[in-house]
C-alpha cells in the first residue's frame, strides 16, 4: 500500500548557498507549489551554522541566524492554507561537534541534522580510508553521536554517504542488521526521527550506481526498531520539490 506523503519538511530556499534556483525558489513559490500538489505541511530547512564554540567553514560562515530572520520576514507577507514550519538543516564537523546549539534549536519548530556530509573534505572529519568498511564505521559513529546530541528532531538523509555514492550499496551492506538495530534503537530511545528522502531514489537520468533495495533495507530496520519518520524532498528547486510523491510508492 502506498504511503500518504502529506508533508515535506526538507525544503531549501534561495537563502541556502546551495539553492539551484535562487531567483525563483522562494517561500511564496514553494508554498504555492505545495498547495497545488496537495502537500499540507512545508518545513523550511535552510543551512545554518550557529555554534560559536566551533569555527564554521567558509561556506557556512555566512549562513547563520540571519537565515531564519530573513525567512520569517518573507513568510510574514504570505497567506497560505499550507501549514508552515520554520526549521533548519544543521551539520556535524565530527562526532560530538555540532553546527548548532541546543539553545538555538529551541528557537525553531524542528531541526534536521546531517550526519553524512563527507563530501566537505576540508571541513568534516573523514574516514580512515575510502573503503566500504571504513565509511560504514564512520557513518555509524556520526549517526550515533547525532541522535544523542539533543539538537536533532530528525536525521537528514540518514546513512547516505555524500561524496561516496558510487559505493553506496557496498557501504550499507557493510553495516550488519545488528549494528543498524543498535543505531536505530538509540534514535528511537532519544525520540529522533528518520528522514525518508528523495535522495534515496536512484537518478532517472545517467547511470544508476545504487539499488533502491539499499535504502529500503535500512528503513525497514529503522521501522522495526521503533523509529518515527519524516518525509523530505531535500528540494533545492521546484523540480526537486515535485519529486516528493515518489516517496509514497
Feature locations, PLM:
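A short acidic, amphipathic alpha-helical/loop segment
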Residues: 98-100, 182, 217-218, 246
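Residues at alpha-helix caps and immediate loop-helix transition turns in enzyme cores, especially N-
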Residues: 26, 97, 210-214, 243
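Domain-core and long-helix interface of multi-subunit machines
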Residues: 14-16, 110-225, 235
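An N-terminally biased module of ancient metal coordination in phosphate/nucleic-acid-related enzymes
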Residues: 1-94, 103, 164-174, 183, ...
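Short loop/turn motifs at secondary-structure junctions
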Residues: 37-41, 107, 150-154
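Generic secondary-structure boundary signal with a strong preference for alpha-helix termini
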Residues: 203, 245-246
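Hydrophobic alpha-helical segments and helix pairs
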Residues: 82-128
Amino acid at each position: 500500500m502506498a504511503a500518504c506523503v502529506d508533508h515535506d519538511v526538507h525544503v531549501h530556499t534561495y537563502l541556502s548557498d546551495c539553492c539551484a534556483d535562487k531567483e525563483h525558489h522562494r517561500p511564496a513559490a514553494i508554498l504555492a507549489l505545495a498547495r497545488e500538489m496537495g502537500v499540507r505541511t512545508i518545513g523550511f530547512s535552510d543551512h545554518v551554522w550557529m555554534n560559536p564554540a566551533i569555527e564554521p567553514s567558509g561556506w557556512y560562515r555566512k549562513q547563520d541566524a540571519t537565515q531564519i530572520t530573513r525567512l520569517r520576514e518573507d513568510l510574514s507577507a504570505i497567506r497560505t492554507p499550507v501549514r508552515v514550519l520554520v526549521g533548519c538543516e544543521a551539520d556535524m564537523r565530527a562526532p560530538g561537534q555540532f553546527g548548532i546549539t541546543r539553545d538555538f534549536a529551541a528557537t525553531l519548530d524542528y531541526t534536521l541534522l546531517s550526519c553524512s556530509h563527507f563530501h566537505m573534505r576540508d571541513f568534516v572529519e573523514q574516514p580512515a580510508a575510502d573503503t566500504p568498511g571504513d565509511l560504514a564505521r564512520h557513518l555509524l559513529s556520526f549517526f550515533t553521536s547525532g541522535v544523542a546530541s539533543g539538537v536533532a528532531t530528525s536525521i537528514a538523509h540518514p546513512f547516505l554517504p555524500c561524496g561516496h555514492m558510487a559505493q553506496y550499496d557496498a557501504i550499507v551492506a557493510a553495516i550488519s542488521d545488528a549494528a543498524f538495530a543498535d543505531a536505530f534503537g538509540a534514535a528511537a530511545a532519544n525520540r529522533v526521527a528518520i528522514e525518508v528522502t528523495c535522495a534515496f531514489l536512484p537518478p532517472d537520468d545517467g547511470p544508476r550506481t545504487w539499488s533502491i533495495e539499499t535504502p529500503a533495507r535500512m528503513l525497514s530496520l529503522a521501522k522495526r526498531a521503533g523509529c518515527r519518520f519524516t518525509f523530505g524532498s531535500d528540494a533545492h528547486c521546484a523540480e526537486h520539490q515535485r519529486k516528493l510523491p515518489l516517496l509514497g510508492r
